[in-house]
Structure formats: C-alpha cells, structure tokens
Amino acid sequence: MSRNFLNEDFGSEEEDDDFNPAPAEDSDEEDVKPQSTSRGRINEEEEDDDHADVKPERADREGSEDDVKEDIDADEADAGGERDEGEDEEEGENDEDDEDDEEEGEEEEEDEDDEDEDEDEDEQDVSSGRPRKRRKRLGGVHNFIDTEAGVDEEEDEAEDEEDEMEFGAEMHPDDLDALPAGADTDDRRHRQLDRQRELEASMDAEKQAQLLKERYGRNRAAATDAVVVPKRLLLPSVDDPSIWGVRCKAGKEREVVFAIQKRIEERPPGSRKPIRIISAFERGGAMSGYIYVEARRQADVMEALEDMSNVYPRTKMILVPVREMPDLLRVQKSEELNPGGWVRIKRGKYQGDLAQIEEVDTNGLDVTVRLVPRLDYGLNEDSGAPVVDIKRKRPGMASGGPRPPQRLFSEAEAKKRHGKYLSATSGLGGKSWSYLGETYIDGFLIKDMKVQHLITKNVNPRLEEVTMFARGSDDGTSNLDLASLAETLKNSTAEESYLPGDPVEVFRGEQQGLVGRTTSTRGDIVTLQVTEGELAGQMIEAPVKSLRKRFREGDHVKVIGGSRYQDELGMVVQVKDDTVTLLSDMSMQEITVFSKDLRLSAETGVDGKLGMFDVHDLVQLDASTVACVVKVDRESLRVLDQNGSIRTVLPSQIANKITPRRDAVATDRNGAEIRIGDTVRELYGDQRSGVILHIYRSFLFLHNKAQAENSGIVVVRTTNVVTVSAKGGRSTGPDLTKMNPALMRSGIPGASMGPPKSFGHDRLIGKTVQVRKGPYKGLVGIVKDSTDVQARVELHSRNKLVTIPKDVLIVKDPVTGQTLDMSRKGGQRVPYGASAAPPSGWSGGRTPMAAADSSRTPAWGGASSARTPAWAGISGSRTPAWKMDGSRTSNPYDGSRTAYGGAGSRTPAWNAGARTPYDSGSGSSGFDAFAAGSRTPAWGGANAGGRTPAWSASSSAGSGNRDSRGYDAPNPGGAYSAPTPGAYTAPTPGASAPTPGAWADSAPTPGVFNAPTPGGLSGRPYDAPTPAMGGAAATPGAGAYGDGEDGGPRYDEGTPSP
C-alpha cells in the first residue's frame, strides 16, 4: 500500500479549483455508470484487486444487482479494507484532501444555488474515508432508523444509489454492522422537511396564500376547462339505466333507502351475490309512498328489494319515462334559515302563528324557535271528561275546545291550578320556567321543531304580530329588531309590490341615496327613473332588496296589503326607515305599517259602506239586541251593541237596518224631553257626553267627536243622562200642558168631552190589512204589533216583518177580501140599569149620547138646526132630503134606512111583485101582507114564500105605535119572526146569549123572535141603533117613520115586479 500511495498523483490546487461535478449529475440516470473523481486517482490494478475482493462478499449479502450498484459497493468495500490494514499515512493524506474538497464545495454551494444538492452528494462520496472519531461526534443512526427504514424501499433505484453513497460517509463502521441488511439511515429528507417548515413559518401569509393558489388553483381551473360539456349531452337517453318507481309505506321512504344502502355495503360488487342496482332515492312530499331505484333491469330491482320491510316490490312497478327523468332528479335549493328570521308553524295548536328562529342545528333539520304561547292554565279543563290516551289519538285531532289567545307566559296564573307542574330553571339571561314539559323564557315559549313543520317561504309577518316579540330593555323600553323583519319581508316581496309610478329610494349599495319612480319590474329587478340629483332623467336598475318606497309627511296613502289595516286611507304623519305612521281617515287613530304596504292614493275620504250598512247605522242583531256600526271592514262589520260590547259580525248575521225616527222622544233623569240631536251628559260613571245619534227604548247612542275609540260612539241609559242643550234652542223643561187635563180638552169650553181613547189591546192586532201606498203598496199581511201611529205587519208575500204607519193600512176580510170599517165600534148594547143613561133598547147605537140634542150624530128631534142631516118641517136643508124624493139616506128615528118611498129613484124600489123585502102601497099605514109571492125568501103560510128574514102578522102591526113595527120584517128578522131556516125553530145562533139584545135585559145575536142586529122592542124616541129592528131603521127597515102617519115602508104603484 505504501508503494501505491507514493506513486499516486494528488494533482495541483488549480485542478482542485477546476472541480467539475458533471459525473454527479449523471448519477441520477440509471443507464449511465457513475464516475468518481477520487476513484480516478487510484491505478487500475489496485481498482481491479478491490473489485475482486468485494464481489464474493456482495454476492453473499445482496445477490445480483445492476452494474452501477456493484461499482458503488465495491468502492465502499475497498475503503473499509484500507482502514482494516491500518495504513495511517494514506488516511491522513486523504483526510486533508477531503477537508480541502469540503471547503471548495462550500464555496461552490454559495455561488451556484442550482447545483447545491449535486455538489453536496459529490463531497459526501469523496469523504467516505473519514476517521471514526469524527463520525462519532456527528451522532449515531438510532434517531433515524424508525422513520426512514420503511420508506426508502419504495424509492426508485437512483435514490437508493444516492443513499448508499452517503451511507458510508454518515455512518460509523461499528454502527453499520449493527444495522440489518437493506436498512436506510439517511436523514437528508428530515433536514429538508425542517428547512421547508422554517421557510413557511417565516413566509408572509399573503405570499403563502398566493403560492397555494398558484399551485392548486391553476390545476383545478385547467381541469374544469377540459370537462366543459353541453348540458343537452348530459340529459338521459335510452342507453342510460332506467328508473323504476316502487311502492312503499308512506312515511317510511327514507328508512327504505337507508336499508338499501346498508344492503349494498353488505353485498358489494364482486361479492358472491352483489346488488346490481345503481342508485336509490326518494322525493317525499307529493310523491310520498314511492321510492325510485335506478337499474338496468327490473329483475335487479326485485332482487335488491327482496325480503325488505316497508317496501312492496311485488306490486306493479312504474317505469319512469326518459323525458321525465330530469324533473324527477332535479333538486331544489333549500331555504337558508338564519337566527333572527321569521317562520310560521304548519300544524298543531300554534298553526299559522308567527315564530322567530333562535338557533339552527348544524344538520339544518332541527330549529329552535321562539313563540308567543297559547295557554289557558287549566281553565277549560273538564274534570269529568273520560281519560283519553294521548298516544292513541290521531295526529291533528286536537281537543274540541277553543284555542286560547296569544299572550306571554304568567307564572302567577300557572301557580293557581298547576303549581305542581311549574318549576323554575336556571338560565343565562331572563326568567326561565318549566311548565307542563315546556320551557318558557321571558314569557316566550322556546320549542325545538323540525324544518318540515315550518313555513319558511312567504311568511309576510305583520307589524302587530312582530310587536309581540319586542324584547324589553332595562330602562323599560321595548326593542324591536326591525332589521331582521325587513330582511324577511324583502325576501318575500313580490313584483306587485312595486307598480309603475311608485316613488322609491335606494337605501343600500353603490347607488345608495338615489330617488326616483319605478317604470317596470322584472323578477327581483326594478327599473326606475331618477328624479333628483345629477342622474336625473336617467334609467337605472336596482334589486328589490335595496329599494324601499319613499313617502313624505302629508301624503295621502292607502294600505294595500300585508297588514290588518288593509284598505285603510290616511295621511302620513311620520316616516322612519321602513316604517310609516299615518292617521286613519275613518278611525282617526295613528297606525304604523311598512312602506312596502302603502301606495299613494288620490281618494280624499273613505267610502265606509258594506252593502246597505254604513258607519253609525243602527242595526237589529236579534229580537232583543240592537247595535250601532262603528267600523266597516271589507267583509265584516264592527258594532257596539246596547250593552256596550264590541262585536264583529257579518252582514248576513244582521236581521235588518233600523230607520232612525226623527220624532223619537225620551226623558232624561230630570223628566225633560230629549230628542235626536240633543246634547246630553252622563251623570254617573265616566261622565261622557255627546250628541244623541239614536234613541232605542231606554238606550241612547251618543256621538262624541273628541273620542277616537269606536268612531266616537258610546251607549248610555236615558235614566243616567241630563240634558246639556236642546237642538234648536227648544225648552228642556217638562211640557206642563200635557200634565193638565183641563188644557187637554178639545172643543169649546163648557162643551162635553170627546170620545175617550181606546186602551188595552189594540183591535188592529191580528187583523188582515192591505197597504194602500208606499213601497209596500198592494201587499197584504197580518198585524203582529202596533203603537199609536205604526204597526208591525207580517207580509204574506215576503214572509217578513215591516213597520208601516197605520194611516196607510186598510183592514180586509181574510175570506172575501172586502174592506172592513174599523172606525166604528158599533155592536154591543148596554142593558137596562147598567148605565146612568136612560134605559133604551137602542142605547148601544147612540153616537155619542141621547141626552143632549146638540151632541147627537146624526141629530134629530125638534127643530134644532144642528141636526145632521137636518129634517122636520118644510126645511130644505136636510142632507139628503127625504119624503117625496126617494133619495133619503137616513131617517130621524132609525137613520140606517136606505132609499125608499116617493120618487122612482128608490133603491131598492118595489111594487107589485118586485118589492124587496116587503110591504106595498105608498102611504099605507096598515099592515100589508101583499099576496105576491115575490118575497125573498118566502116562508110558510097561505100567501108567503121565503121571507128573509121571516116575519109574522100581528094585531098590532097596523097600529101607529113605533114599537109595534118591530114585528115587521127588518133585516135581520123581527120579534117572534122565524129566522132562517124556519119559524119557531132553533136559531143560528141561539137565543141564550145574543149580542146585542132584542129588548130590554136581553141581547141575542141575532135572537129568536126578537133578534135585530142591533135593535130592540123599546120605543124610546132617542135611540138610534145601526141597524135596528122594531122601531129602528132596518136596511131596508120596517116600522113607523116620520110623524107616525106611516106604519111601514111606502111603495109607489107602478113599480115593476120581477
């Protein structure tokens, strides 16, 4: 070895400076054999010997490898053999050369950054003969064996070559012998990883993000560009797998799909019995009860669903057409729910109620909401009701009781009946209570619900609903989150909210502050024309979410929707952000609504009518209740009834509208008269005052302009008010003239009192009447009730009750339809001794009395000129005249005779056989039986036929006594004459209780033997029954007339007979 060492040429410093690391670059190539500069300095003989010594050892250790591996191993073995021989001098020279090379390598590393890694590898190759003492100082390999041993086996051959070249330089020979064969102990990658981490830690975050974007973003974008495919090519075709609809149990669709997924995991493709379906899904909603399976064949679907519960593959499957597949697989974007948003409840006790989102679970399926509770605190519980198992009750079958109103939770109310179900719970903020298994915080119900049980679209919360959710602050004021409310409303704003011409304002975005008027709307984009600023006259587009309607104080607007004040008209009094406060034209109250629910209105007032009903109308709700209309809505009326209660009724629930009576009068507490239009004040209570609008029995409906509640209408009792001022300056004191009977007498002082008024039951009630004028002219009905001037008539044709004045009614016979005279009471006579007046058989027919000549109507007797009609003597003022003219209408003694005697104008006249009903011969004073058979009807006897009514001959018939003429044939029959039928037979009606009587102390109706209607046997000269018999005037009558010359009716000769 000494000879070889001496003969070796170490070169000069210039050659060291010209170190060329080119062979190191070729070491990465597998086909090129690496060359070492240090090995080139050894002669070929020595190199051949080294190779010969190492080959058997490598054959035993690693087996056959490629040529590059063998050369590298041989060099390492040669270096180890030299160290074993103990050639210290050669090691010293090599050590010096290595140190020089390392210094040169460090300089090269600083100058050439691109070749840093290759130079480092060459230096390690040259320094393979480093002394063990120095290698010990560098540390062992135990820190790197566990992490690198299993990694390098998977590297390529070039990396293995580099590691083996470094192995001898980095490892001590003793450590090298302890390693297993093929172990890799390189720590270069660890040091490289450490350097990379230090570089990233010192790198700026923005620069690091830029590097990541360049590294990954470019690749992703390139991949996207390469996969652009027209959508029409993605549509399914007949070559794609088919989709089959399979029936399943409703509500179990998701469970069936999960069961299919589990079965696919148990029997994956490639197993003994794989599941050959491609996919399975369900749609729910309207398509519940079916699952959809994608497969090539129907047999694959049946095999996959065999023996699976809740699904029925044996039933008829539905093959989805190819053109319907895209609709079946189209996925709609779910509504994003955020805390603070507004939703509505779909079902249950809180159906339709507004709720605020408190929290949304990470899965997006469960939501915690805040509700205004509906609790009755056990007030509607029925302790005697049967116990019902809640679990067995069908869903949606709630209790039949009314739904409690919305109000905040009250622990005081809950303690009254359900104290055992109430408990306080600890919370982070506010009062928290647990009641009947529910949690209440600050009076609100906190409830967990599924998203499918909520309405998330078109919620349209009203301002009055949101006001209930206002949170109270420490200073007592309520805080309302209008921002979240406005955001919810913006999401549900439809196109019809903005119409052309609406003034709008942009309140967010780049165009904030622009004011204009809308020209068109397309989806969520509104086109508007700018009216103010530098862009005036230009057309711009803005999203609906950035717009709000713009109003000024004093504008007259109309509420168009989204609020319970819909169709209200009013004037804007305040504008604040999205809310507008206006003064209603109808109720004169301030209401607050959103600007999106308003629109400029050209109307200056409010119609206030719903059909035939208007504000302040008096209506009849039922038989005993009336009310005054205080507000008219679109479909209902708000009324204030006589008891002071406010009701909401439909027009169909109102019986009728009461027409106000201008002459209605009542008395106040002091007895003074009060009428419509008077101003009164309440004496006790709230001491309200107002103008009388309606008077109904003992109730007054007042109108107070200073009161906004109920449109200024109040109801009071007449006994609780006093008059403040009368309409037109009328005296408010009691009417004294009506309180003095002497001043109420009519006629000349000293004259007799007029006929008394009728009291008690009105004779008109129950009569059949006909209306002779007015809107109901010609209609017939029955009088059900009446007052002094009006009557309540039930019309036959309309089957309804109407109020009609009495003066337009005519009493009709319900059978014949003839008009009846109700002005005369007639009829009943007063028996002898029953009255202070002189007894008379005809006393019942006197009008009004028989004592004084001047008061008789018609008057008679003497020569008084006050008789109407006058008679006696040769006076020509009789109306109508009588004696020889035949047109006399009444007789001074029995004035109901109609036309007889004298002239040919007698009605009816008779002579010979035409006489009706009896007697013959004008001027005959005796009884005339006349043998003619023309009497109608005559009755038995030699000369008589069917007299009507029958009569009887009497010895006194021919006497001049007026009473004796009572047996001549009056109408109806006279005394002892036969009624119809037959004489002396049973009358119709009988004689036991006639009304009125035929003679003194009796009054048959009509009587047997003496049954006039009315009439009697008395010969009292002043009696004048209508009609009468005996001495009275019949129609045609019988008896003595005039001055007694005549014993019966006179008949002129020559009267034709029938």
Curated annotation (Swiss-Prot):
Localization annotation: Nucleus
Residue ranges with Low complexity bias: 975-998, 1023-1038
InterPro entries: KOW, KOW_Spt5_1, KOW_Spt5_2, KOW_Spt5_3, KOW_Spt5_4, KOW_Spt5_5, NGN-domain, NGN-like_dom
Acidic residues composition bias: residue spans: 10-31, 63-125, 149-167
UniProt xrefs under SUPFAM superfamilies: Translation proteins SH3-like domain
Biased composition (Basic residues): 130-139
Origin superkingdom: Eukaryota
GO biological process: mRNA processing; regulation of DNA-templated transcription elongation; regulation of transcription by RNA polymerase II; transcription elongation by RNA polymerase II; transcription elongation-coupled chromatin remodeling
Stored CDD domains: KOW_Spt5_1, KOW_Spt5_2, KOW_Spt5_3, KOW_Spt5_4, KOW_Spt5_5, NGN_Euk
A family per Pfam: KOW5_SPT5
Main location: nucleus
Described purpose of this protein according to its UniProt entry: The spt4-spt5 complex mediates both activation and inhibition of transcription elongation, and plays a role in pre-mRNA processing. This complex seems to be important for the stability of the RNA polymerase II elongation machinery on the chromatin template but not for the inherent ability of this machinery to translocate down the gene.
Assembly and binders: Component of the spt4-spt5 complex. Interacts with RNA polymerase II.
Family the UniProt entry places it in: Belongs to the SPT5 family.
PANTHER family: SUPPRESSOR OF TY 5, TRANSCRIPTION ELONGATION FACTOR SPT5
Name of the protein: Transcription elongation factor spt5
